[in-house]
Amino acid sequence: MQSAARQLKLFSDTEEPGESPGFSVRESGRAKRLSIKVYPHGRVEVVVPKRTRARDVQSFVDEHRDWIKKTRASFAEKHPPQPFALPFRVRLAAIDRSFRITYRPVRASTNVRFRRHGDLLVLTGKTSDEKLCVEALKRWLAALARQEFEPWLRSLSALTGNSFRRLQVRGQKTCWGSHSSSGTISINYCLLFLEPSVVRYLMIHELCHARHMNHSRRFWQAVGRHEPDYRQLDRRLGDSWPQIPGWLGIY
């Protein structure tokens, strides 16, 4: 039997009256029940336990159609869509640094490369192609996140006594981080835009999954031993998506 995630495709965000809101489906081994997430720019994600039937997902979404539409409308009012524009300056709160960005076109080039000179980032190539520029900026953020976050994560690993096998840096659209059963910690490079205290909490959270691959009472007790203010930081982390610049296209 195909999974719900494979059977249900991503619907458009401009559904016809009477139809279900557009949504994507993500299967989670940790999920015990179906849940719906609405992101600031209107994207809707349904998180389901493994082996959930597609028709059950559709029924669940239909049940919550009014709530989804109200939530999306509320987000649209608070976070109106901004016109797309490539950045010329980027502020990364997590590492307390700002970077200037310049774009240098190269005739006949078919790609865009980046090179960093201190706090200046230079993109060269087919810079008239905004998509290629954004992809280059994402590669730069991923490389910088690995450079900055790996020593930080290893330091917290020693502090908490929780180990990990390797670090993976990605640009996930659905989560800030994860810890696999094989010991791989995945961290979202968008954390570079958040405050250091929130990033530190996320790292401690994922490291504590080395001993508790769930969100049980023991897990939260472990987190609390190393970050007493975890409840407030967890709420701040969950509310942080609007801090990510729109040109990244993350949500």
Language-model segment annotations:
Residues 1-201, 210-251:
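Active-site-proximal or metal-binding-adjacent scaffold patches in catalytic folds
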